[in-house]
Design a protein with these regions (language model features):
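Charged, amphipathic alpha-helical segments
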Residues: 14-15, 44-45, 106-109
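N-terminal glycine/threonine-rich, aromatic-flanked beta-hairpin/loop signature
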Residues: 41-77
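Edge beta-strand at a domain terminus
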Residues: 107-143
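Contiguous, well-ordered beta-strand patches that form the walls/edges
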Residues: 65-115
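Short, cysteine-centered beta-strand-loop-beta hairpins and adjacent loop/turn segments enriched
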Residues: 36-41, 68, 96-100, 132-133
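Tryptophan-anchored aromatic micro-motifs
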Residues: 23-44, 63-65, 123-129
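Short, solvent-exposed coil/turn segments at beta-strand boundaries
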Residues: 51-58, 80-84, 114-122
Length: 143
């Protein structure tokens, strides 16, 4: 019972946070994805949502765009100190549309750095996909 209490609740308390140095990224982040298809010079911008579900022992990431959803297969959080927090993950991407001519399935990798701006948490970084796409992500925590 003590492990469960710590895993789900206690580690999020400010006093405990100051001792364990594990950042709590739990919440919903909204923002923009700016991408470039390989070989093309035009940039595309899309609205995106990242949902982070975190306990002391586990973390899951679900990334949603207008036409697809990505789920993290492997996640790494690097915490050098409270000002240098990096989140890396490998993901599978699935199509929302159901259209046969869309090629929205794939895999990829993402790296985001946590930044504080005007008291708000931001996750910013890059992604690369097996569909020869790459781009920049700029997200802000909304809950």
């Amino acid at each position: 019972i003590l492990v469960w209490l710590f895993d789900v609740y206690l580690w999020k308390m400010k006093l405990v946070q100051s001792m364990i140095k594990m950042p709590n990224l739990d919440g919903t982040y909204k923002g923009k994805l700016t991408r470039q298809n390989d070989g093309k010079s035009e940039l595309q911008e899309r609205d995106i949502t990242l949902t982070v579900s975190q306990t002391w022992l586990t973390m899951s990431l679900v990334f949603e765009g207008e036409r697809s959803q990505s789920t993290a297969k492997m996640i790494l959080m690097s915490v050098q100190d409270p000002k240098h927090i990096v989140l890396n993950w490998i993901y599978d991407c699935k199509d929302y549309t159901g259209l046969e001519d869309e090629n929205l399935y794939g895999e990829g990798t993402t790296e985001l750095k946590l930044r504080l701006s005007n008291g708000k948490r931001k996750l910013q970084g890059h992604y690369y996909s097996s569909k020869l796409r790459h781009g920049h992500l700029d997200l802000e925590q909304i809950s």
